[in-house]
Amino acid sequence: MNIVTKLLAGVALLAAANSAFAGETLDRVMENKAMVVATNSSWPPQSFLDDNNEMVGFDIDVSREIAKRVGVEVSFQTPDWATLTGGRWQGRYDLGVGSVTPTKARAQVIDFAGIYYYSPYVYVVHKDSTAKSVEDLNGKVIGVETATTSEDFINRKLEIDAPGLPPVEYKLTPGEVRTFADSMLPFDDLRLGDGVRLNAVIAPEQTAMNAIKNGYPLRILDGGYAFREPLVVIDEKVDPEWTAKVGGIIEEMKKDGTLASLTAKWYGKDYSAD
């Protein structure tokens, strides 16, 4: 086989390999007339099980609307966070709608279909705490959910991969950081009292407000957000056509006010604006 023939054979093999992935997820979704969404079952009000053991929440409504516009049915799976954000789904899920932050590390293993809302992170203290500012929390015990942007933030390693965001300011030097496997577990410790186990929690404003609404004796510290993060719909890094299709639907949902309505429904205010 001469050099030209070898080169042509190599190009053909590369093209064949690429075509094997072209449209892979989109073709599967359209053939099955259904898509499987990876999300969380214990993160109210984003996604959780109601009294009838049905999945409900903001992320669930967003998923259903995307499926409706694709023209297919939707079902939900609830892998752990590392699986959801780690890619290599091997076709088990078609989409991830779990309030995922686009970081530089995640961009290596998953595709970002589009930003569908923004989440301001806040400092939360017990209602009896004497803390009045972020500076009052220096040297204190801070709780965060593990493997999240709140953990990256408290460790001063936050790298959000999105244009137009202001630089992150680090104003807090904790005495100790305690991590938790679930978003509500830090609040469960904080509700026991100021300093009993924690002095503060860094969490999304929406999650904190939901905890307070449900009777947790907490308050959000005045003085502004810790940081503001974009949240993206994600998919496996195998099908640019599917990524683009879902991204187009997200843009439509922004323009026609659907995302504004859904954030207002679940959070009481519009978190969809850029």
Model segments located where?
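Extracytoplasmic small-molecule ligand-binding "clamshell" domains
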Residues: 23-99, 245-246, 253-256, 265
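A ligand-binding cleft/hinge motif common to bilobed small-molecule-binding domains
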Residues: 83, 100-108, 152-161, 188-227
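Short helix-initiation/N-cap motifs at beta->coil->alpha
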Residues: 76-86, 168-192
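Acidic, polar ligand-binding/catalytic clefts
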Residues: 64, 68, 73-136, 219, ...
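Ligand-binding clefts/hinges and TM-proximal coupling segments of bilobed small-molecule sensing domains
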Residues: 24, 149-172, 177, 216, ...
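Periplasmic-binding protein-like
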Residues: 41, 117-125, 171-172, 205, ...
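Extended ligand-binding regions for polar small-molecule ligands
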Residues: 24, 61-69, 128-131, 135-149, ...
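Bilobed "Venus flytrap"/periplasmic-binding protein-like clamshell domains
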Residues: 36-44, 55-68, 101, 122-181, ...
